[in-house]
Amino acid sequence: MLFRSACHPQLIFPDFDGISGKTEQIIDTFDTLRSEGHKVLIFSSFVRHLEILAEVFRQRGWKYALLTGSTNNRPSEIAHFTEQKDVQAFLISLKAGGVGLNLTQADYVFIIDPWWNPAAESQAIARAHRIGQDKQVIAYRFITQNSIEEKILQLQEDKRRLAETFITDSEALPALSNEQWADLLK
């Protein structure tokens, strides 16, 4: 519940009629990039969060593509984004878009809510970093200050450090405590 509230109040209170500070920041950043002709991949772990953004996009007349686990025609949504210049946003659920996509048309990636597993975010960002990409790709992570999202970022960093130790220093493996092993395997 804390995680959802950091994303958008409507994820907890369906009748909420306002806009969150995070959503305002996402929209403002996207609007600037859109006006400069950039294409943006927008990832969320909550389909409802993407639907909230889609509604704002519709209200502003911005064209977008949407890919979630319930998308019936995945190739059509991908083509909609990759082939149409005026479709500058691709709203993608982390689980549906984590693998098998080559979206080099995008040069910006938004992670609008952090995921517990840093590898999932890395895979999302990698959708734009593919063979054929000729532009620099910039990733933004939208984090609500003083929220559980900051704790998730710290957890991600701890997991990265443990994984790095595991991969690069075989001597350190026996030195890991039970707690460190448990954290690594979470």
Residue map of PLM features:
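Conserved Helicase C-terminal RecA-like lobe
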Residues: 1-101, 171-172, 177-186
